[in-house]
Amino acid sequence: MRFIGSKVNLLDNIQEVIEENVKDDAHVFMDLFSGTGIVGENFKKDYQVLSNDSLYFSYILLKAKIENNSIPNFSELKKIGIKEPLHYLENEEFEISHEFFLTHNYSPYMGCERMYFTVENASRIDFIRLTLNRWKNESLINELEFAYLLAILIEAVPFISNISGTYGAYLKHWDKRALGKLKLRTLDIGNNHYANKTYNEDANSLIEKVYGDILYIDPPYNGRQYISNYHLLETIALYDYPEIYGKTGLRPYVESKSLYCQKKEVGNAFNHLIEKANFRHILVSYSSEGLLLEEEIESILKSHGLPETYRIYKMPYRKYKSKHKQEASELHEYIFYIQKDIALTNSVKSNKKIEVGKHKTNSYIKSPLNYVGGKHKLLNQIVPLFPDKIDTFVDLFSGGFNVGINVNANKIIATDINTYVVEVLDTMKKTSVEEVIAHIERRIEEYGLSKSNEEGFKAFRNYYNKTKKPLDLYTLICYSFNYQFRFNNNQEYNNPFGRERSQFSPALKKKLVLFIEALHEKNVQFVCSEFEHFNFSQLDQNDLVYCDPPYLITTGSYNDGNRGFKDWNRLQEIKLLDILDHLNSKGVYFALSNVLSHKGLENELLLEWSKKYNIHHLQHSYSNSSHNTTRGESQEVLITNYTNYTK
């Protein structure tokens, strides 16, 4: 949805600032003034995300898309016969009652003069809101399910609103789209396998209670209060029957006025925010026409951060509908960066009390494939737990090859059941960087691939499904939702278009080049095979088998058996554990990534088996309290049969 100050056009710039300055292994990204959540949603693929906004309707959008890692099941609704909640909410019949707040106050019903919605659409919105409240009160939907359905409604409302852009005023005649019927569309939910968290608090109060690695700050720039422009979305979200006033039916918002919109308060508020920020890396988006001057922001950042790390990036832009072209050309969007002298959040724990030395470098190569369950965020905890010297390293469930590419071994064998992924990696291994980049850029030009050309994307997807050329798959992924790959039961690529988010950006190109260059320097053999068919007899006591199988007690597209590839079940788990026992009897090293518990479930089979070996607890996700774990988090572990770790 359109939102004042949206950073959709600056996502690549933000990414590049992070790439240039964040050289350590950051895990936790916080978007403190999230709005509709476009920034947090974009970086959800790379980090555990904390998001916050003081507006409740924004908070609902965040909770639905950031905190949810999948589309909810609505199991309780199904028990009462409602299998498709959206269809029910769109089509169920109702009668207008005195409870229908929008109908009575924002549509031409019973003499009301306001024309924000037609009576048909206003009453449908009222029916949906009352129904969602009832379902929630009757425990038919939980908090995340409520947020998901309400977020869908909030995102649908602007398409049938009789406004020019914001809700500061309604049109005096009916716009064509306002006469259309309210349509509810499912949300695209990305899964990063982290316990993401959303907040609905004042930023300056919240900053004293949270911590992480990267803090992104995008405060209001001027005296314009967002609440007045989006008062109707706030009322729909809260549905609290406010005492409205004025011609446009504003809700009271004196207490909601942001300090960042007040000239006398903004300096102190920003200074407090930076001073209290318990984050190592801080990025600030601002504008040259904002209340704070560039020099003021620089001074505050340097007073609380490391002055030598200060950076400013200026992006010129044309002021929307400006009549003063010269003045508009001098406007800039800023991104400020500073580093604070604060440690990162990551740590390694071992129940055997084995001292783990720091790995030689904090810089790890990242796979260009956004593979579900990828271990890039855990590399700084996993790699130091590998033996000092490895002859042959077997990456038995290699996936996107995040682990194997970062291991020092005389020989690396990477196996995976997904033929298409193996072919992409093998092609990159056998092809020069120049040829790979040239191929990608040819396809981009040929199909007109961009963040907005969905038709070009679909045409290219159809072409790939007919030809199955490996580098075309990678190119396709670059323009797909969340940069992920997904196949149906016919093994056809079916991931949707990543509108306004995904593209082969300079930052992505840089990552790809680094990965291929590292790949060419290693002695790697890629093999498409099921794990039990690997020839383990070729291994001896100087070798290491690393296993990152699908997790038995979690669900994902990689282990549900519904994507044209073999599923993962208890029998598969037993086979793998038997193989590892056999390797141990031969004196061959192994390391197994897995989870002992997840969202209240325990892998009892693994818990019992692991007692024979060394269990190292990894910090997979982070709470915002003084404790390391919270209810519902995954207990991520690395299980090894050796103790001679990298020093």
UniProtKB/Swiss-Prot annotation:
**Keywords, ordered alphabetically:** DNA-binding, Methyltransferase, Repeat, Restriction system, S-adenosyl-L-methionine, Transferase
Question: What InterPro entries is this protein classified in?
Answer: Ade-mod_methylase_MStsI, Ade_MeTrfase_dom_2, DNA_methylase_N6_adenine_CS, MeTrfase_D12, SAM-dependent_MTases_sf
Enzyme kind, highest EC tier = transferase
In the record, what lineage is assigned to the organism producing the protein? Bacteria, Bacillati, Bacillota, Bacilli, Bacillales
Q: Which SUPFAM superfamilies match?
A: S-adenosyl-L-methionine-dependent methyltransferases
- EC number per UniProt: 2.1.1.72
Motif Adenine-specific methylase 2, residue range(s) on this chain:
548-551
Domain description:
The 2 adenine-specific methylase motifs of the protein participate in modification of the two strands; the first motif modifies the sequence 5'-GGATG-3', the second motif modifies the sequence 5'-CATCC-5'.
NCBIfam families named in the record = dam
Q: Which GO terms describe its biological process?
A: DNA restriction-modification system; methylation; mismatch repair
Q: What is this protein called?
A: Type II methyltransferase M.FokI
| Chain span(s) of sequence motif Adenine-specific methylase 1 | 218-221
Q: What GO molecular-function term can you cite, just one?
A: site-specific DNA-methyltransferase (adenine-specific) activity
Pfam families recorded: MethyltransfD12 (PF02086)
Record note on quaternary structure = Monomer.
Q: What catalytic reaction does the record list?
A: a 2'-deoxyadenosine in DNA + S-adenosyl-L-methionine = an N(6)-methyl-2'-deoxyadenosine in DNA + S-adenosyl-L-homocysteine + H(+)
